[in-house]
Amino acid sequence: VKIVVERDPIKTSFEKWAKPGHFSRTLAKGPNTTTWIWNLHADAHDFDSHTNDLEEISRKVFSAHFGQLAIILIWLSGMYFHGARFSNYEAWLSDPTRIKPSAQVVWPIVGQEILNGDVGGGFRGIQITSGFFQIWRASGITSELQLYCTAIGALIFAALMLFAGWFHYHKAAPKLAWFQDVESMLNHHLAGLLGLGSLSWAGHQVHVSLPINQLLDAGVDPKEIPLPHEFISNRDLVAQLYPSFAKGLTPFFALNWSEYSEFLTFRGGLNPVTGGLWLTDTAHHHLAIAILFLIAGHMYRTNWGIGHSLKEILEAHKGPFTGEGHKGIYEILTTSWHAQLALNLAMLGSLTIVVAHHMYSMPPYPYLAIDYGTQLSLFTHHMWIRGFLIVGAAAHAAIFMVRDYDPTIQYNNLLDRVLRHRDAIVSHLNWACIFLGFHSFGLYIHNDTMSALGRPQDMFSDTAIQLQPIFAQWIQNTHASAPSSTAPGAAASTSLTWGGGDLLAVGGKVALLPIPLGTADFLVHHIHAFTIHVTVLILLKGVLFARSSRLIPDKANLGFRFPCDGPGRGGTCQVSAWDHVFLGLFWMYNAISVVIFHFSWKMQSDVWGSISDRGVVTHITGGNFAQSSITINGWLRDFLWAQASQVIQSYGSSLSAYGLFFLGAHFVWAFSLMFLFSGRGYWQELIESIVWAHNKLKVAPAIQPRALSIVQGRAVGVAHY
């Protein structure tokens, strides 16, 4: 591998910035109509449309990534700065069960200071639900000064990233061959980012986080705990907490690794003081991950003729019934960044769902489990992110099909074979959606009807006709019994939610307990299956028919987004790949809503609550999920209305901001319908009347007003929706 760069390829100049639309011949001429500003935004980052040169496109994307990292670091710096300057972090650290986290104080302008509630410890501010305090505690931050230093450090890193983005586009821009060298990239990303990244975090946890958290858990005042660098430079300090530290690296080289089991543990379960995972378990986990990825980062063939070649692996990958197998896929992934991105988004989206579920079932940070608002926010956040990632995967897969797919190279490989039997795939998926839709909804309708007729004995419920999720219960059971059977080394199962164990309470609140699954969960899980399958149907159909269909055989020539196939072809509107993404987004929202409703209600009903001195648990909604959520009426009455009414009645209290957001969000949603339920022609006619009036008064603008195009109107609508 030779690192090939081109020196000074493009001179640095701000002249182009002064010329809006410099990237397109038509846009650079300036505006004739108001459509110009929309096209400017739509195409500014569509590098494919600026040039066909893959090397130039790759350099722009690469450079933009540094800019993205800079923005992320600036944002993070702001979070840490708020923690340093406007928060009650030190107070929270000394009493995390009674004091609520706050890092924002509203200034007294037009009475807004009503939003500053009493969060405890003599601090008035807005309670935050981002989980930052819990992360800071887990990483061993004990003072606001440390947060301040970290914030400054992040800004310095952001500046470095901005410099790197400029440098690698203007001063030393990589050649195309460098972007296409997948083996070298895999080695560096696996060993460097994931391997050394995990190793350095594990090192930080062992040397800084663990001793500090050990002392905090024991009730030592944060101000008396030695500073982080003292633990690193003075081994005796750590050795007082973990005696094996005194032996240094001898046990490591002597292969007596069990000596280190004081701070690299395999306990399972949660720390009873904090309600979070044992940080000694997570340190061990990151060390193990680091080893795996450091090995993985040495598996691919570069300068020395050993290791895997990705092209060889893909081309050897064929079964008896799969034609040419993965032949041609290597060429796709090295010449189409859309294809590459689609795969990565799909996998990252799936991973994000896993993260969402682990945040509550295995709370990774101290005191996260008893901060219910934060738990709910983190779940919601990761679910939304996952939705955008998965829809984005379909969008870029479709763009790949339209712009980058070359049917002459892809013959009888797996991609070609999937495309050739797409009718079978889509019609089967359609059948699955119909089946799931009628059956899942039908179970609810049956229950609503029986409930209305006063026949509870004929309902599907845990107390009448049971539909127990036996497979899910079996999975729960195998995991709950693992410590005594398949995982003899672990002291407890991976999560309290599996069952078997007792509940864990921290500060009089339930941190976690075994989550029972019953008929109500069985019903709502089939709604999940339904909404997810419909989302997949819409998105996959968009990808499989992006280039051609029986209706429009030459769809590839029309591009990724087009409103209709021209005059004289009725019934061809809303058929572009873009429109499938547009429709898929609505079902993604649908799916997420049901997921978040299910999670919110289930946790409040069966998990979250307070515990008395006698050990009696009182759940927030009193365990009403199992009997109430089995009818549509129950969802409307006992969840949506019961919970919304609290928000609606919040005006005039410190919670009023949430009531206003609630109102405002519904307002924005209703506003979206104006774009979605109206025709373009209506607005064009209206605009022309208004322009006529302006002409009469001789105040007509030079730039002609035009209604949004059909696609633009839909984009604005779906964004507000």
Curated annotation (Swiss-Prot):
InterPro entries tied to this protein: PSI_PsaA (IPR006243), PSI_PsaA/B (IPR001280), PSI_PsaA/B_CS (IPR020586), PSI_PsaA/B_sf (IPR036408)
Positions that bind phylloquinone: 683
Biological process, per Gene Ontology: photosynthesis
The protein's Enzyme Commission number: 1.97.1.12
Positions bound to chlorophyll a: 674, 682
Catalytically driven reaction(s): reduced [plastocyanin] + hnu + oxidized [2Fe-2S]-[ferredoxin] = oxidized [plastocyanin] + reduced [2Fe-2S]-[ferredoxin]
Pfam families found in the cross-reference section: PsaA_PsaB
Main localization of the protein described in the UniProt heading: plastid
Cofactor note: P700 is a chlorophyll a/chlorophyll a' dimer, A0 is one or more chlorophyll a, A1 is one or both phylloquinones and FX is a shared 4Fe-4S iron-sulfur center.
Membrane topology reported for the UniProt record: Multi-pass membrane protein
Superkingdom of the organism of origin: Eukaryota
Sites where the protein binds [4Fe-4S] cluster: 564, 573
Top enzyme category: oxidoreductase
Keywords: 4Fe-4S, Chlorophyll, Chloroplast, Chromophore, Electron transport, Iron, Iron-sulfur, Magnesium, Membrane, Metal-binding, Oxidoreductase, Photosynthesis, Photosystem I, Plastid, Thylakoid, Transmembrane, Transmembrane helix, Transport
Secretion signal, residue range per the UniProt entry: none
Matching Gene3D superfamilies: Photosystem I PsaA/PsaB
Chain residues that bind chlorophyll a': 666
Localization terms from the record: Plastid, Chloroplast thylakoid membrane
GO MF term set: 4 iron, 4 sulfur cluster binding; chlorophyll binding; metal ion binding; oxidoreductase activity
Regions that span the bilayer: 61-84, 147-170, 186-210, 282-300, 337-360, 376-402, 424-446, 522-540, 580-601, 655-677, 715-721
Subunit structure and binding partners: The PsaA/B heterodimer binds the P700 chlorophyll special pair and subsequent electron acceptors. PSI consists of a core antenna complex that captures photons, and an electron transfer chain that converts photonic excitation into a charge separation. The eukaryotic PSI reaction center is composed of at least 11 subunits.
Cited function: PsaA and PsaB bind P700, the primary electron donor of photosystem I (PSI), as well as the electron acceptors A0, A1 and FX. PSI is a plastocyanin-ferredoxin oxidoreductase, converting photonic excitation into a charge separation, which transfers an electron from the donor P700 chlorophyll pair to the spectroscopically characterized acceptors A0, A1, FX, FA and FB in turn. Oxidized P700 is reduced on the lumenal side of the thylakoid membrane by plastocyanin.
Family the entry assigns: Belongs to the PsaA/PsaB family.
Name of the protein in question: Photosystem I P700 chlorophyll a apoprotein A1
Natural source organism: Ginkgo biloba (Ginkgo)
